[in-house]
Amino acid sequence: MAKYVIGSAWPYVQTVPHLGNLIGSVLSADVYARYLRLRGHDVVFVSGSDMHGTPIEVEAIQLGVDPADYAAKMHNIVAELFKRWDISFDLYTHTHSDVHIKFVQDFFLKIYNNGYIFTREEEVPYCPRDRIYLPDRFIIGRCPYCGYERARGDQCENCGRLLDPKQLVEPRCAICGSKPEWRLTRHWYLDLRRLEDRIRRYVEENPHLPPNAKEMSLGMLKEGLKPRAITRDNRWGIPAPFPGAEGKTIYVWFEAVLGYISAVAELKGEEGLRRYWKSPDTKIVFFVGKDNIPFHVIILPALLLANGDGYALPTTTASTEYLLYEGDKFSKSRRWGIWIDEALQLMPPDYWRFVLVYMRPENRDTNFTWQAALEVINKVLNDDVGNYVNRVLTLIKNRMGGAVPPPGTPAKEDEDFVAKATDLFKKAERHYDAIELKDALHAVVEIAREGNRYLNARAPWDLLRRDRESANAVMYRAYWSLKMLAAGLTPVTPRSAEELWRMLGVRQPSWEEAYKPPEAGAPLGEVKPLFRKYTEEEVKNLLKRLEELRSQKAARRYPWEQALL
């Protein structure tokens, strides 16, 4: 039994996450954590709401509400939505907890005392009307690259370029629209140059990093790491603990990545930190979208090395490409995409989970379309998987006494089928181990496809009339393949898999159970269809329903009122 810390990127809670956010981090992490638990491993799966930083502060100011109240309300909503998506966190916390705040301040003080932090002055935008500095999203203007009129001070949403506020054309305060002035301020910097060689070794010698994470990180290292400011002049955030840093907060990206550690401390205490985060035997795995790679592969390891308190470096960062919606990026401002609260108003979570993992953007951007989703649900989930389950179990239930038949005397075709199903199950296992979740699910589905071909070829309904021994042999092995199917589906569609285990009469599901020959005579549970189809007309009605829901949301002022629960 191995030890694992699994972490999914902490979502900003200025709004509800969308489907791209979900598959890029939280859902993928949940699938992997569920798989590891099914294998019997010791798993701690943590994440939480990123409650600080400029997105929340800007939105709160514009709405005239307190950022702490805003963030707390949205945290509760997002936490509840993740429960409804069956995300199996051991702890879903937030970055404004007492544990996290104290941990971050103590952690950075240690880095400061170790000599890896220095100060320097720089010019930053300041709004004289609102009397605040304008970091990151507090300032907007025209992008110098693509001309987008509402580019932010840290990045252009339209073309994706990283920006500095001084690059913006006609910059203005995001709150009041005033032209900013430039003022000198002092900030505290992490000296990444002193850590560069050790980070390079970590990246180059890490066999577990996926190609996109390794390539992006090596590209940054080739350009040379520069000192990064770890403080901001925000009012909302964790107060910087350094001498002379009164009125400063820790930059949100630098404190949020420490949440993976503070969450384990909150859940397991100091002993838990030693057991999971300070043990060389622990495998630490993060799940993020590709835009979060630098902070997990470069920044967090740098912080751990600079702290010097014996924390293990992450084993890998499983990073996806982007999920597009009908050919374009998800966009809140353009209402383009589907958000996780909306999705659950349209279909049950297992349908969404299956579709998203089946289409997971592992190696390249993937385009979610309703036509493709409908095909996955109807042809793959229902026809291939659900139909095979129903064919096997209804035949055993209705014509073989409702119990697992004896193994009979197998023909070569029967032995070949078990060998094929087992090979596919082992293939799924290898892909799950390698965090190739889409390929794992495809291998699981192939078990059902092989099963349908096997039933068609052997026709056990005919064998029952003339050769009971052969019929027993066929259905015994078909039942066995359903145990493999149930185990393979458990991480992806937990509710449906639980129902399948129940129908199979298996009381203690595990991955290893799938390898065990069935117990002849064991009774089945009540058999009923696992999945259903959706017609094109139903999808049209779902999209109509989506527009109605959005009209209701648009009429509500506050984001926590707009969320659909």
From Swiss-Prot:
Q: Which cofactor does it need?
A: Zn(2+)
Q: Which residues bind ATP?
A: 332
Q: Where is this motif: 'HIGH' region?
A: 11-21
Catalyses: tRNA(Met) + L-methionine + ATP = L-methionyl-tRNA(Met) + AMP + diphosphate
Q: What name goes with this protein?
A: Methionine--tRNA ligase
Per UniProt, what is the name of the gene that codes for the protein in this document? metG
InterPro entries, per database record: Anticodon_Met (IPR041872), Met-tRNA_ligase_1 (IPR023458), Met-tRNA_synth (IPR014758), Methionyl/Leucyl_tRNA_Synth (IPR015413), MetRS_core (IPR033911), MetRS_Zn (IPR029038), Rossmann-like_a/b/a_fold (IPR014729), tRNAsynth_Ia_anticodon-bd (IPR009080)
Q: What is its EC number?
A: 6.1.1.10
Spell out the molecular function terms from Gene Ontology: ATP binding; metal ion binding; methionine-tRNA ligase activity
Q: What does this protein do?
A: Is required not only for elongation of protein synthesis but also for the initiation of all mRNA translation through initiator tRNA(fMet) aminoacylation.
Q: Which domain of life is it from?
A: Archaea
Mind telling me which Pfam families this protein's record contains?
Anticodon_3 (PF19303), tRNA-synt_1g (PF09334)
Motif 'KMSKS' region, per the record, lies over: 329-333
**Main localisation:** cytoplasm
**Segments passing through the bilayer:** none
Q: Which organism is it from?
A: Pyrobaculum neutrophilum (strain DSM 2338 / JCM 9278 / NBRC 100436 / V24Sta) (Thermoproteus neutrophilus)
The record's Gene Ontology cellular component field reads: aminoacyl-tRNA synthetase multienzyme complex; cytosol
Family assignment from sequence similarity:
Belongs to the class-I aminoacyl-tRNA synthetase family. MetG type 1 subfamily.
Give the matching Gene3D superfamilies. Answer: HUPs, Isoleucyl-tRNA Synthetase, Domain 1, Methionyl-tRNA synthetase, Zn-domain
Which residues does the annotation say bind Zn(2+)? Answer: 143, 146, 156, 159
